Structure formats: C-alpha cells, structure tokens
Amino acid sequence: MADTLGRTHPTIQAKADNAATGPVRLVLFDIDGTLVSTGGAGMKSFGEAFEAAFGVAVATEKIKFAGRTDYSLFREMCRHGGIDCTAENRELFFSHYLRLVDNHLDASKGGPFPGVVRMLDELAAMPDAPALGLLTGNIREGARRKLGAYGLWDRFALGGFSEDSEDRNLIAAAAAAKGGEHLECQLDGPEIVVVGDTPNDIACGKHIGARTVGVATGGATLEALRACEPDWAVADLTHLSATDICGG
C-alpha cells in the first residue's frame, strides 16, 4: 500500500475490501497510545491516588492498563487493595487522581504521536468533513486534561468515556449514539471509523460495525493488531491519510 507521496510501506496491512464504499460521518479516536503519549502520567497517578485516598499501596505494574477503562481499573485496584468499590470511594479516588495527573502531565515529556496532528488537520479540511470524537476508557475530565496538555482537546466534538460504562463495547455504542445526536442522524456502522492501539479498540469498533484502524504506537505490536483483522494496521499515523480511511 502506498502513501500520499506514492511510497510503499511494508508496515501497512489493509483489507482488500476496506476501500470506502460510502461516506464516513464520524471518526473516533482512542487517547492513550493512539493520539498521545503522556509519559505514563495516568498509570503513575492511579497508584499514587489510591494510596492518597485509602492509605493502601497497590502495585500498578501488576495491572494491565492498555485498552482498559478507568472505572474497571479502579474496581481491580479495590480488589487488590481490599477496598469497597462504592460510588463514594470512586469519587474520592478520582478527585485525587485528577490532581495528581495534572502534576505528572506538567512533568512529562509526552505529546502527540507521529502523524496525529496531520491526520486531524486532514480530516477537518475534507470537503464533507466527518465529525471527530473520542472513544476512550478515560473519565471525561481525565481525557480533557490529557489532551488539553497538548492542545488537542478542542479538536473533538464528542466522546464516549468511562462514565458511560466499564465495558469498552458499551462505550463504543455510547460514542456512536452521541455522534448520531451531534450529526442529527442515525449512523450506520460503516459510516464510523474507530482508531486505536490495542486489540480492545479494534474489538469495540467491530462491535458497533465500524471500520477499524489499528496503530502500533501504544499497547500492542503491529503483528498483534494485524491478528485482530482491522481494516487497516499501521506502525503510526504517518502511514495513513484521511482519504485512505474516508475516501474522496
């Protein structure tokens, strides 16, 4: 497959039938490992916030964060730490988390991955530009702070977040529904593209019938993403253009 300059990239795998057969109305992006690297700000903040809130240390290195939702991660940490997973405890935990994630973002050397800003610019400049949204396991305010740290939050009109569900498939469904409300139409699955860096991102995109892009900048290797059979699998977003995924 060739890029917009005609160069062939062996890092790209595309399905034979993934050419856009109809308009793409909504493109949904995961955040961590897909849009940005935060230098581990989220993981560090989770461990520190749990100890600050409950006086219990939980080894976050034993917990798999990639492709997860914040609410499900909090539930797992409660299980490890012997803390009741109540709404009150969750609210207390995330109040500490947001304070700490700000500190870690300020100290981190993170930023957007290669090709991200160009892709967002290209999508926004298309004649019939799709709406841009988020499909993330972050709580909404955590997402705002992570993307805001790198000037990207205002690029997105809507999103599905951890508040919508602990189940990523249901977050995807919520994001699609919000996209339909934003566009004032009923969206069909193929009118949506989901971009993410883990098998869970690809799976939730398929759950709503969307076209899927696996990008190997975060939680999974290119080979692992290819095994999930997304519509596109790329090393990073420099190897894909807006017209590749949206047509035109």
Give the role of each language-model region:
Residues 4-66, 72, 78-80:
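Active-site neighborhood of HAD-like aspartate-dependent phosphohydrolases
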Residues 15-16, 23, 28, 102-134, ...:
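Short, acidic loop-to-helix structural element flanking the phosphoryl-transfer center
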Residues 38, 42, 112, 165-171:
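Phosphate/oxyanion-binding active-site loops and adjacent basic polyanion-contact surfaces
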Residues 43-47, 71, 75, 94, ...:
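An amphipathic alpha-helix signature
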